Every structure is written in structure tokens, then in C-alpha cells.
Amino acid sequence: MLKWIKGGISAVTGMAEPEYGKDYIHSVADRVKNKQPYRETSREDFFWQAPDHTNVESVIFYFSDLKTGIFGFAQVIHSNIIGLHTASQFTFRIFDSKNPEDLNIWTSTKLENFYIEGPNFYADNLSVELSEDGESYHIQSSVCDLSVVDLHIRRLTPGAKIGDDPATYYGNNINEPWGSMRHVFWPRNACHGTIKVKKEVIPESDEEESSADEDDNEDEDEESGDSEEESGSEEESDSEEVEITYEDRTITFKEEDPAISTFIMAFQGMKPHHAAKAWNFMFFHSEKYSAVLMEFTTPKSYANTKISAGIITDDKEVLAMTTNNLVEHLNSEIDSVGWKVPKDIKITFKGINTKVKDEQLESENGTEQALQGEDEKEDEKEDEEEEEYKNVAEENKICAVVEGPLNNLVERIDVMGEIPSFVKNIVSGVAGTKPFIYQYADPKSSTLQINGGEKIHGVAWTEVTFISESDVISEESYNEA
């Protein structure tokens, strides 16, 4: 009971969690062990859940142009803090991976008067709508003048989720969890429409002077302290008078020659630093194939448990949904903020063809122990199921490997600099929490290899996220406060 109380309190307040161990994490992967993990999504799978307890829910539409190397995403984030404060944000990124200095725009805009209708999301000057047939989304946003978005996303393959219930639960009772994590996917889609951006134009002659002024201002701010707020306001007023010049640009993805998209709906029903200590996300697209990986590792409070979802598709079908994946960070070096950041990445997906049904994986002898004790029957049934699974899986295996460099950094995002102050105060109270997201875009060097076949070249987007330091489990590890 004490653990349950502590878990419930910490899940909503952000306090450091005690040691629970693996019995308090109910992985979606465990529920589909020795079964077919793939389930096709329905329209209802993409209804917003929006519960009244602490959670963060989001939809994110990634796009990548195989020809131009332009990457990006449009995202709506809906959050609820302790049931007291609800907020929504629209974030947008566009990046030219072949000419990074020419186009790299990021906007994040607070939404007003937002509301949810099933799978649809609305706010002032924004709408995200799922078609009645569940085949396409239409995203329109003019909430920020710097990034006006009008995109259509159409499924090229079925949607994908792990099992009938694609959620991982936290707590001692799976029926009454104190936290959860859920993902549903459209792994490969066509994206057409327009993106109108305003790119800030900085005269070359002013760049060095501007940089020097920024350094001087930082020094002055440190010396003046909080007592000179009035002076700071005057400086801010002066800076606002500086005229900023923008270059208008329109990026168009044609319906007959679309960009390729990956769409994900995510739900996180607890504080971010309690749910996971690290994340790996990647999508790979080529003319004929796609691969998607979403993986997180829990904090030591939940025994550093890894939960991994992988998807391999061709241009029409989902080939495999995998939970047995290996992410290798290669040639890593500690950077200026203290994280061990990889220079290359290798991801191995292991699973079975989606055409294999659960019935084929069930042992024919699973119901023949009627006269045996319950425990003995259960043990024998598990052994037989595992053996049967191995036999069928070997005949229908899908093993895919994605490899690529992480040398084209889009941005290193300081999460603490992006989240609202009331959330920041909660998260920063936990020692060792310093969340950073590293985003990379590779326009040509990444490869996908399926079942030892030829290596297929394509584009890849990778996000490596570090949240808290907790590699080794010990008694001291659980005393983070």
C-alpha cells in the first residue's frame, strides 16, 4: 500500500520515486509475448483521450522529401498538470538537410480556445481533422505568421499498434495504474500541400556586430542583477525597435509527387521524467520501404526497463511489427552538456511477418493437461507456446537493420528551456534530470537491409533524448531527491 500511495503522489507531483522494480511496470511487449504483436489500427484508436489527471498527449506529422532532402514536422501537444492546468501548443519544424544554413525554422505557439472532438483538434486558427473513412488527415495552421501550414496526410499502408491495447502501464495493479504510455502509428503516408515560412534575413555585415552585442548584454545582465529590472525593460524596448527583415518562402509538396510522412499519436499519463529516462526515435524512408522505431527506457524506479516498438513496411503493407529491437549508439562522445552523444546509429529489428496469425503460434497441445495441477499446466503451456513460437517465427522471420550517420544535427533542444515554468519547477526538483533532445536529418547515407538482402538507401530522421542519469540500479539510485 505504501508504494501505491508514493507512486500515486509522485506521478502527479513530480517528486522523486522510490524503488518499485519490474513488477510495477506492465509492458505492452510482455502482453504480446509469443503472439503476433501487430494489430491494424481503427479510426477510434486516434481519438484523443484527454483524461482529467496529469498527462501529455500529442499528434505529430513528420514529412520528408526524398528528392530535396527537406524534413520537418507539425505537432499539436495537449497537456494537463495535476488536473488544474490545461494547455495546448503547436510546434513546427522545417529543415533542409542538404543546405542546413539555408532553411532551419522552428516555431512553438501557444494555442487559444482549443477543444477536442473525437479524433479532431481545433483552436483559434488551427484545425487537425481525420477523415470519416480514417484514411487521411488535414492539418491547417496559421497560428504563427512564421509558419503557415496546410498539409494533407494520406495513408499508404495500414496503421499499426502493438496488440489490442498498445499501452504500457505503471503501478502494482494494471487495472488501476498510476501512469501509462501509449503509441499508435501510421508508419508510411503521402504528404502534399503547402508550407509558407518567413525566414529571418540577417545582413552579413551585421552578424559579427550582433553577436558581440549579445555577449556584452549577457555580461551586463549578470552584473546588474534583478534590481535593475527597469533598465532591462528599456533595453528590451530598444531591441524591439530594430526592424527585422524576413524572406517569404513557400514549400510545396505536390499530390502527384508527395513527400513521405510518418504520423504518431502518443499519450503519456504521468510526469515525463517518471515515465522514461531516455528515448530513441527514428524513421527511414525510401522509394519502396519504410522503417520506424519508437523506444524508451524507464528510470531506475522501474528497473531500467526497455519498451520498444518497431515497424517495417513496403510501399503498401506493414511487413512486421517488432518489439525485440536493439539500438546501438556508436562512436559516442561526451558533449558540452555532459551527455554521451552518438556519432552513428545502428538499429536491428527482429520480428515475424504480419501475415502470421495468433492461431498459428498457439500450441496444439496447450489444452491437453486437464488432469494436471494449475501451476504445472501453466508452466508446460508457456514452454510449449514459446517452442511453437520459435518454430513458426523462424519460418516467417523479419530481421531488418537500419544504419546511418548522426553528423547532420538539426538542433540540440534544451527541454527545460521550452517547457512552462510551473512544469520546469516540478521537473528540476529531481537531481540528475537534464533533458535534451538531439535531432538529426540524413538525406542520403542511411540504409535499410531486410533479411540479409541488398542495402537500400534512403532518408532518415533520428531523435536521441536523454532525460535523467540512471544507468546502474542500487539502493542509492532510488534516492534522487
Curated annotation (Swiss-Prot):
GO biological process, one term: cellular response to oxidative stress
Keywords (A to Z) from UniProt: Cytoplasm, Endoplasmic reticulum, Golgi apparatus, Lipid transport, Membrane, Nucleus, Transport
Gene inactivation effect: Leads to an increase in cellular ceramide levels and a decrease in complex sphingolipid levels. Mildly decreases cellular phytosphingosine (PHS) levels, with no increase in dihydrosphingosine (DHS) levels. Sensitive to Auroebasidin A (IPC synthase inhibitor). Simultaneous knockout of NVJ2 to leads to myriocin sensitivity (sphingosine biosynthesis inhibitor). Simultaneous knockout of SUR2 leads to a growth defect.
Span list, region Peripherally associates with membranes: 1-18
Free-text description of this protein's post-translational modifications in UniProt: Acetylated at the N-terminus in a NatC complex-dependent manner, which is required for membrane targeting.
GO CC annotation, single: cis-Golgi network
Main localization (coarse): Golgi
Keyword Endoplasmic reticulum: yes
Additional observations: Present with 45200 molecules/cell in log phase SD medium.
Entry function: Ceramide-binding protein that may transfer ceramides from the endoplasmic reticulum membrane to the cis-Golgi network membrane, and is thereby required for the biosynthesis of complex sphingolipids. Required for survival in response to oxidative stress. Involved in the diauxic shift.
Designated name of the protein: Ceramide-binding protein SVF1
Native source organism of the sequence: Saccharomyces cerevisiae (strain ATCC 204508 / S288c)
